[in-house]
Swiss-Prot record:
Domain of life, per lineage: Eukaryota
Family indicated by similarity: Belongs to the cornifelin family.
Keyword Cytoplasm: yes
Transmembrane annotation, as ranges: none
Pfam families the record matches: PLAC8
Designated gene of the protein: CNFN
Quaternary structure and partners: Directly or indirectly cross-linked to CE proteins loricin and involucrin (IVL).
Cysteine disulfide links: none
Name of the protein in its database record: Cornifelin
Protein role: Part of the insoluble cornified cell envelope (CE) of stratified squamous epithelia.
Cytoplasm is among the record's keywords: yes
GO cellular component, one term: cytoplasm
Length: 111
């Protein structure tokens, strides 16, 4: 015996609001951590490889085209930091040492 369907199933929608935060330190706060500042200034690729490794990615990621950009964007996504891909691109293109230092400081604070 079959029964006719008298009502359609309703879709359940759950809306989660996520609170976005800011970077713990500013882009130009390089001197807050002098060892990171010196490494970012004189050996930025070494710092980039360390950041990548500390973030759980392959240490060769910074050498790939767009690798640093995806790393910074991934960091923003994981830690729910406000920003955009365009701002990530601008920071890494026009102020690479400062952006790397900011990323390294953020990892130190969050980990």
């Amino acid at each position: 015996m079959s029964y006719p369907v008298t009502s359609q199933p309703q879709s359940a929608s759950t809306c989660y609001q996520t609170q976005l935060s800011d970077w713990h330190t500013g882009l130009t706060d390089c001197c807050n951590d002098m060892p990171v500042c010196l490494c970012g200034t004189f050996a930025p690729l070494c710092l980039a490889c360390r950041i990548s490794d500390d973030f759980g990615e392959c240490c060769c990621t910074p050498y790939l085209p767009g690798g640093l950009h995806s790393l910074r964007t991934g960091m923003r996504e994981r830690y729910r930091i406000q920003g955009s891909i365009g701002k990530d691109w601008a920071a890494l293109t026009f102020c690479l040492p400062c952006a790397l230092c900011q990323m390294a400081r953020e990892l130190k604070i969050r980990e």
